């Protein structure tokens, strides 16, 4: 499948093709996110807390 975009990747593992945690707050988690958490910022936003493959540094449109 296609990798989701992520403006700001947080922790990544050290593998050759790293899996990362994306720090972005999004209206809904991407398909395939293993651990989606709701973050209360006044409006319901979500953050994917599992290690996933992302295109890091790619703005999500």
From Swiss-Prot:
SMART domains for the chain: BowB
Bridged cysteine pairs (disulfide): 5-60, 6-22, 9-56, 12-20, 29-36, 33-48
Keywords from the named record: Disulfide bond, Protease inhibitor, Serine protease inhibitor
Pfam family, any one: Bowman-Birk_leg
UniProt KW Ubl conjugation keyword: no
Entry comment describing in which tissues the protein is expressed: Expressed in bulb (at protein level).
GO molecular function, one term: serine-type endopeptidase inhibitor activity
Protein function: Serine protease inhibitor. Inhibits trypsin (Ki = 41 nM) and weakly inhibits chymotrypsin (Ki = 410 nM). Does not inhibit bacterial subtilisin.
Protein name as catalogued: Bowman-Birk type proteinase inhibitor B5
Lineage: Eukaryota, Viridiplantae, Streptophyta, Embryophyta, Tracheophyta
């Amino acid at each position: 499948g296609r990798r989701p975009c992520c403006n700001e990747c947080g922790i990544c593992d050290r593998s050759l093709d790293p899996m990362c945690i994306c720090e972005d707050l999004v209206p809904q988690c991407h398909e395939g996110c293993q651990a989606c958490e709701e973050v209360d910022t006044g409006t319901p936003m979500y953050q994917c807390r599992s290690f996933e493959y992302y295109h890091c540094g790619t703005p999500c449109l």
